[in-house]
């Protein structure tokens, strides 16, 4: 029974570490990804060694179950850490002057554009936001422009702009 619980525990650690390693690699944090990859491999070898030492159906099922539960935990951890930035586009039918001001008052940089849509003139706001602040931005948009169409893109790399100036001031 102790080995079964150990297999489960190792999987519940292994998969979230795997998730974080993948995220760090995608975000360009290769040193952290390398360290996490080493830890991940050690846990993987230990857990698999226990399963192969005593090939029982229960051990294999617990290994697979631990992997599935680990994915849930890894996803939860990733959402809580919210590493990185998103480029958010807010599309509106009317010029959102009040929303633009409120977004800026809340410390976000915003650039607005006018374009031609199928049914007439449309407006687009581009806002770069730390993922940890996405909920704040979403709530502002919902409050001031409830009919707005919102799209978020993962921003892996960027240079200059209002956000970096703001980050340098706050450090």
Swiss-Prot record:
Cystines in this chain: none
Q: Quote the CDD domains the UniProt record gives.
A: YitT_C_like_1 (cd16381)
The record's keywords, sorted A to Z, are: Cell membrane, Membrane, Transmembrane, Transmembrane helix
Q: Kindly give the InterPro entries that the UniProt entry links to this protein.
A: DUF2179, DUF5698, UPF0316
Q: What is its main location?
A: membrane
Q: Where in the cell is it found?
A: Cell membrane
Q: Which GO terms describe its cellular component?
A: plasma membrane
Please report which protein family the annotation says this sequence is part of. Answer: Belongs to the UPF0316 family.
Name the record gives this protein = UPF0316 protein Exig_2248
